[in-house]
Amino acid sequence: MCCEDVDAPQNNVAARVPFTRTGSIPRVFRPPPPPRIDLSLKIGILTVSDRAAAGEYETGDLSGPAVENSLTSNMGKLNSRRSQSDGTTAMINFVAKAIVRDEIEEIKGQLLSWCGKDRVGGSGMDIIFTTGGTGFSPRDITPEATLEVIERECSGLMSFVAAECASIQPLAALSRGTAGICGTTIIANLPGNPNGVGQCLDILVPLLLHAVKDLKHG
């Protein structure tokens, strides 16, 4: 489900509820037209998971690659729409990936580094996606770490995403993910479930392109 972390135990009721995905985006959601400006994006993908950081998964980290794959798919769809209208494009020219434990200082340290806050005059990523640690487990502290890093909160963004996702899977409403701005970087918390990641990004990516445009270009 959308808010279920990959670390969640499989012996509880919530973990046994199958993820329901009837389409790539909820029927009630209509993506806004892409911004009419060329965008070249630097993306950070941060997996927050004790077990992934310890290398305990036989398959390796799944949620981080799910973020990258969904981003690539969504950007392709949006660029198809853009080229048909005005010829502008949004390109991902750099992707950084990392895995940290569910520890506030580790999460904060990586976020601040990617925001360019660890060097004088350093430029950061355009968007950072975290995946994992947004649920109700005592170790789910990604939103708390994010709030200690961001300078301006954009809580309405993830509230909207959660509401749209809940129209497909009601348990998506249990996600505590937030979003905000640190310098010129937008940070957004995604769930740790790979399917939930895709569902959220179907909604989030079209909105974030406008957010980046406003933040970087006014």
Model-derived features with residue positions:
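Non-catalytic beta/alpha edge segments that cap or flank active sites
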Residues: 1-218
